Amino acid sequence: MAAKGARMIIHLECTECKNRNYTTEKNKKNDPDRLELRKYCKFCRKHTLHRETK
């Protein structure tokens, strides 16, 4: 059987309202630190910083 890949599904949480708005994949070997992206939050109705959660 083939080995399982290094890519994991992560959730992105808005830093202002704490809602988990996005899911994405990342490679844990290439990017061991937490991901931070500025994305649109539909609850805040503006672009905010979203951080990776478990």
UniProtKB/Swiss-Prot annotation:
Coiled-coil regions, chain positions: none
Keyword field: Ribonucleoprotein, Ribosomal protein
Family matches, as InterPro entries: Ribosomal_bL33, Ribosomal_bL33_CS, Ribosomal_bL33_sf, Ribosomal_zn-bd
One MF annotation (Gene Ontology) recorded for this entry: structural constituent of ribosome
Gene Ontology CC terms, in alphabetical order: cytoplasm; ribonucleoprotein complex; ribosome
Keyword Lipoprotein part of the UniProt annotation: no
Keyword Ion transport applies: no
GO biological process, one term: translation
Family to which the UniProt record says this protein belongs: Belongs to the bacterial ribosomal protein bL33 family.
HAMAP family reported in the protein's UniProt record: Ribosomal_bL33 (MF_00294)
Protein name: Large ribosomal subunit protein bL33
